[in-house]
Amino acid sequence: ARQAVQESLVLLKNNNHLLPLYPSSNILIAGDAADNIGKQSGGWSITWQGTNNQNADFPGATSIYAGLKTQIDSAGGNAILSPTGEFTSKPDLAIVVFGEEPYAEGHGDKDNLEFERNNKRSLKILKTLKQQNIPVVSVFISGRPMWVNSELNASDAFVAAWLPGTEGQGIAD
């Protein structure tokens, strides 16, 4: 499963060769999907809609944050988790992990494929970090193609990670 995650990542943008990262850096890991195995697993995981799950409900699973932290720590870097993107010491770069809420069947029906159409909270985090001259890598979690032009334009690097399930470490690899 971890190898499948590695091989299914789609790099949509990589300005100034920001990726691969230098994990010895001070890295902020932000976004509501960074440490959320339920969100990275999608619908039909534990519960029908894949909602109201905790990381502890997935024994042996690794969140994207946990996978990144392992890589960063082993390289002598520092990983700081902040779902809202706030920090006390300016990071060298930020990885923002965001995406769709889990869904199954009709609950996932949309009349428009624009991501966060009426509430651009993820875009706000990206723009706030960019305004502070922090390079931003976006990791987008989704079970289907979505219109993310605004988020793509607000990022220095952008990775479509689809639904990595329990193997968040595959994104860090």
Predicted regions and their residues:
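C-terminal non-catalytic regions of proteins with extracellular/luminal or membrane-system context
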Residues: 2-173
